[in-house]
Amino acid sequence: MITPRPLGLYLHIPFCVKKCAYCDFYSITDASRMDAFTDALIRSIREYGEKSAGRTTDTVYLGGGTPSYLGGARLERILHAVRENFALAENTEITVECNPESTDAVLLDALRRGGANRLSFGVQAAHDNELRRIGRIHDFAKAKNAVLLAHEHGFSNISLDLMYGLPGQTQDMFLDSLAQCLALQPTHLSCYGLKLEPMTEMGREAPVLPDND
């Protein structure tokens, strides 16, 4: 008898304070819809949990959007629903994407109670002028403090996202951002090149980007 492969569960949390200038993922800013969304998502979790009976799940990923903007109480409800309706493997990795601006002690405590064991922070750059150019709502000091706070709250598995090819960015600036992110001792670091999508703010404006050299 062939044993079914473990499942990977992705939950999209579409809410953002504002849309970043480069982002083409689906997102909304209407926070008044958060409670209704959470209730609907939990109903879907129960439905799909029934359909997955007999299979284990070894990865759970809450992406967005900005999952942390949903708030600790709602995220804790969602994470508990996942645990109650899916057969999680003993070492299941449960990741929640966090924006530094919406990360605080209350959120981190709720994520711990919900069973999250990995956080992913969209740092993107260590220079505030670069962050402003791409429409990020946080500065690097806020990002640094959020990562340190996560460590203090017991999260040892932390991933950071960093971008290169930003408008006005030099190679030295990127390398400095890389060094400052590595100094935060993440478990994982992802580097992404800026891609101008046509339906985004930056795609419509077509800023001058660094050359490939």
Which residues fall in each region the model found?
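Local cysteine-cluster metal-coordination motifs and their immediate loop/turn environment
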Residues: 12-25
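C-terminal scaffold of the Radical SAM
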Residues: 2-8, 27-51, 55-213
